[in-house]
């Protein structure tokens, strides 16, 4: 940030007027995310609509067991359902949290399920920078390393720890994906009145500031 012209005081970064917008100008207004099946490629941005499954629920519900923690078997079933749906363009990412798989390898199993059980585009892991790199490496096996470096094959979700905080885990994952030409969604995790002002106007102002900072950082 300092090299780009921002005022950095400890962990606080202040962006001068216009810096964020100048950096954001270097990002494309739309891009194509490539799928294993080229017919399933999606264009993100512009006036395009891309529908994907829900992201991150720890619980599932079925007719026999009711509400319970999700398993890897549940995850695979949701990936299959997403693949079968004509209404969904995208396979998503963490369609549920498979709690029966250790956290340090869970991302590998989830990504493999998306790759094997669907030919739609998918999202990478963001729960640790090394897991983001694992996602890039797995895509290198699926698509070819050169193809991954020249094309977008993942769109991953980066959460901002509102108010106005980017933690090292999410920023590390963002840096990995940006360095490998992969796209990210910058999403502030905000509840009005808790991590943001009570008013709608105040909350939206904070959302805009956090998103501008996150997108600008990804373009550094």
Mark where each language-model region is.
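Short low-polarity hydrophobic stretches
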Residues: 1-3, 114
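Helix-rich catalytic cores of soluble enzyme domains
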Residues: 66-220
